[in-house]
C-alpha cells in the first residue's frame, strides 16, 4: 500500500489545507487540484530516474487501494471531530461531526474493512488512557 504512505506527501510542498476549504467552490477546488498535481509532479521528478515511475504510480494507484486510503482519511477526520467535540469544542466541530458521522455510516455500507474498524474501536474514541486501560482490562 505505497499509496497510503505517499498520498499526502505533496503537502510537504503546498501545505495541508482542510477539505472544506479546498471544496469551498468549483474554482477553488480546481486550483487546489492544479497545485497538488504540480507539487506531486515536482516530487516525482526530484527522485532518482529509476524511482520516478514507481513514485508516480504510488501517488495515483486507482482502484481498491485508493478507495481504502480515502476511506481511512475520512475516518481520521471523523476521529478528529469526535475528539474535538469530546474536548468541548462543539462550536467549531459539532456540525462537522454530524456530517462526518453520516459519511462514515455510508462508507461502512460499502467498505466492510472500515465497518470492522469502527465496530472494534470507535467506542474508545475520546476516552482517556486510564479509561481505555480499565475498559480493556475488564474484557
Model-identified regions with their sequence ranges:
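Alpha-helical, largely C-terminal catalytic domains
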Residues: 1-139
Amino acid at each position: 500500500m505505497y499509496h497510503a504512505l505517499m498520498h499526502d506527501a505533496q503537502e510537504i510542498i503546498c501545505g495541508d489545507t482542510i477539505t472544506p476549504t479546498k471544496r469551498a467552490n468549483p474554482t477553488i477546488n480546481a486550483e487546489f487540484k492544479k497545485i497538488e498535481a504540480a507539487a506531486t509532479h515536482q516530487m516525482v521528478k526530484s527522485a532518482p530516474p529509476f524511482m520516478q515511475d514507481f513514485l508516480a504510480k504510488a501517488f495515483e494507484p486507482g482502484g481498491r487501494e485508493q478507495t481504502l486510503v480515502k476511506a481511512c482519511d475520512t475516518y481520521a477526520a471523523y476521529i478528529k471531530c469526535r475528539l474535538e467535540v469530546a474536548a468541548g469544542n462543539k462550536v467549531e466541530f459539532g456540525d462537522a461531526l454530524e456530517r462526518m458521522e453520516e459519511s462514515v455510516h455510508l462508507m461502512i455500507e460499502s467498505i466492510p474493512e472500515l465497518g470492522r474498524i469502527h465496530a472494534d474501536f470507535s467506542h474508545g474514541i475520546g476516552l482517556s488512557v486510564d479509561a481505555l486501560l480499565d475498559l480493556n482490562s475488564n474484557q
